[in-house]
């Protein structure tokens, strides 16, 4: 009996060691890319940036953020100059910006809508109704005098006369939203303020369609990949994609992946450089990339020491992209250096 117990002790130790090894595999960080394709730009502001857009001249763009922050570039985003629009004594935060040609729009809280038809040389303010459900969250320029605006309660409006009149596209609001994203073909996805459910809307729908989250983890944000496929980010840096085998089922999702392998780090937004290459950004300088549609991921370790959270990544095309952070920090995608 003693000899049997003596054999069991080493066996138990071996099993325990294997269990620890298995658990630690999930703690290992993702591999790193060999070269960093992002250039850090520090602007003279302590604001958090919300969005970025360019005119039909990709050298000329605008950047908006909290505290009425507005910056303009005329060299493709290499350098930026701060611009000031007199909004009186109101304390506003700009939330969205969009251009179609030289015509542009800026939204802001609590009730700001600005319009330009000369690339931003002159901005005019458009009065919004006091009955507007929620505050302007974002806007999409669609063509001459045409734009679509969404509020933080999910009310969607469209103008075809330069902002003089607006038509409601949805009868009911979705409730306070954490994030709202629009696809190129006009679909929307909104994450609830607490992250416990999400809602979708397609052109022609009269109401938003609610969907339960697919796990116990609260949702951080959702969006589209440019090809009508949804991505999802949940607490702990978890990434999922709508299931290709069920394109019409908004509740069918791929297996969850954790690119950072660090549950304490949250990812907040995804941007697609190409249909296969996507970048995810988040807290504590987190930037990760996948070049196979989201199956495998690599860290950009060169950016992890930047003392900021990254909230949004935007690609205008394969060669021009930006990551927006806080405390005046943005990153510019520089094609002179390619990621591995």
Curated annotation (Swiss-Prot):
Compartments (UniProt record): Cellular thylakoid membrane
InterPro entries: PSII_CF48-like_dom, WD40/YVTN_repeat-like_dom_sf, Ycf48/Hcf136
Lipid-modified residues, N-palmitoyl cysteine kind: 27
Biological process, per Gene Ontology: photosynthesis
Record's signal peptide: 1-26
Lipidation (S-diacylglycerol cysteine): 27
One Pfam family this sequence matches: PSII_BNR
Topological category with respect to the lipid bilayer: Lipid-anchor
Keywords: Lipoprotein, Membrane, Palmitate, Photosynthesis, Photosystem II, Signal, Thylakoid
Principal subcellular localisation of the protein: membrane
GO cellular component: photosystem II; plasma membrane-derived thylakoid membrane; thylakoid lumen
UniProt note: phenotype after gene disruption: Deletion has no effect on PSII activity.
Function: A factor required for optimal assembly of photosystem II (PSII), acting in the early stages of PSII assembly. Also plays a role in replacement of photodamaged D1 (psbA). Assists YidC in synthesis of chlorophyll-binding proteins.
Family under the similarity heading: Belongs to the Ycf48 family.
Assembly: Part of early PSII assembly complexes which includes D1 (psbA) and PsbI; not found in mature PSII. Binds to the lumenal side of PSII complexes. Interacts with YidC.
UniProt domain comment: A 7-bladed beta-propeller torus, about 55 by 55 Angstroms, with a depth of about 25 Angstroms and a central pore.
Stated name of the protein: Photosystem II assembly lipoprotein Ycf48
Organism of provenance: Picosynechococcus sp. (strain ATCC 27264 / PCC 7002 / PR-6) (Agmenellum quadruplicatum)
């Amino acid at each position: 009996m003693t000899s049997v117990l003596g054999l069991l002790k080493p066996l138990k130790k071996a099993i325990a060691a294997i269990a620890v090894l298995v658990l630690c595999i999930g703690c290992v960080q993702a591999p790193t890319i060999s070269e960093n394709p992002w250039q850090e730009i520090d602007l003279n502001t302590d604001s958090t940036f919300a969005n970025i857009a360019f005119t039909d001249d990709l050298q000329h763009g605008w950047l908006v953020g909290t505290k009425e922050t507005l910056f303009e570039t005329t060299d493709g985003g290499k350098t930026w100059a701060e611009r000031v629009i007199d909004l009186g004594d109101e304390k506003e935060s700009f939330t969205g910006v969009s251009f179609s040609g030289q015509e542009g729009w800026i939204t802001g809280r609590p009730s700001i809508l600005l319009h330009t038809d000369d690339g931003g040389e002159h901005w005019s303010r458009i009065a919004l109704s006091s009955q507007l459900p929620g505050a302007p969250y974002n806007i999409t320029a669609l063509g001459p005098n045409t734009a679509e605006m969404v509020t933080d309660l999910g009310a969607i409006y469209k103008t075809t006369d330069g902002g003089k009149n607006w038509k409601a596209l949805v009868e009911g609001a979705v409730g306070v939203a954490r994030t709202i994203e629009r696809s190129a073909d006009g679909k929307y996805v909104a994450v609830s303020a607490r992250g416990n459910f999400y809602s979708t809307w397609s052109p022609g729908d009269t109401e938003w369609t609610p969907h339960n989250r697919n796990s116990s983890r609260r949702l951080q944000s959702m969006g589209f990949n440019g090809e009508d496929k949804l991505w999802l980010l949940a607490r702990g840096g978890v990434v999922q994609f709508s299931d290709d085998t069920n394109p019409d089922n908004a509740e069918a999702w791929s297996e969850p992946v954790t690119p950072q392998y660090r549950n304490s780090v949250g990812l907040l937004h995804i941007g697609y450089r190409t249909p296969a290459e996507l970048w995810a950004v988040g807290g504590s300088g987190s930037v990760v990339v996948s070049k196979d549609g989201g199956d495998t991921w690599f860290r950009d370790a060169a950016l992890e020491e930047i003392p900021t959270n990254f909230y949004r990544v935007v690609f205008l095309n394969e060669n021009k992209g930006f990551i927006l952070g806080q405390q005046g920090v943005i990153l510019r995608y520089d094609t002179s250096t390619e990621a591995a």
